[in-house]
């Protein structure tokens, strides 16, 4: 390795190590209650995201609703091979609701991204129908 590049690689490595904990997102596994309901409140930091996920089977329906203290980007997605599919996607929403109709067995994720400069308080509710 060229000795002139060593300081650059060292500084780049240190920067990645220092930044890694701050880049951590909040990933949450859904835990349904006996009535098929899931409720959660959290805070999404600036430039971070929160993701709530669960494996769902075909025929299931999930009614979802959320309210945030400021606009966020929102989506419901799943991965199919290398492709990402989005049954729902909204930008700049402070609240929304809808129903996810599950057509294939996948891990579905409800995701909120905070593109703002301040923390956003988020309250969400999911209700699963078998």
Where do the PLM segments sit?
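Cleavable N-terminal signal peptides
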Residues: 12-13, 23
């Amino acid at each position: 390795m060229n000795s002139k590049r060593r300081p650059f690689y060292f500084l780049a490595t240190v920067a990645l190590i220092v930044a890694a904990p701050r880049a951590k997102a909040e990933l949450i596994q859904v835990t349904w209650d006996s009535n098929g309901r899931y409720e959660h409140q959290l805070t999404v930091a600036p430039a971070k995201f929160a993701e709530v996920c669960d494996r769902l089977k075909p025929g299931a329906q999930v009614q979802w609703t959320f309210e945030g203290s400021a606009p966020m980007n929102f989506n419901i997605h799943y991965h199919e091979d290398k492709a990402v599919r989005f049954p729902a996607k909204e930008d700049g929403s402070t609240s929304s609701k809808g129903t996810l109709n599950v057509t294939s067995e996948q891990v579905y994720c409800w995701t909120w991204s905070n593109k703002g400069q301040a923390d956003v308080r988020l309250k969400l509710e999911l209700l699963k129908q078998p």
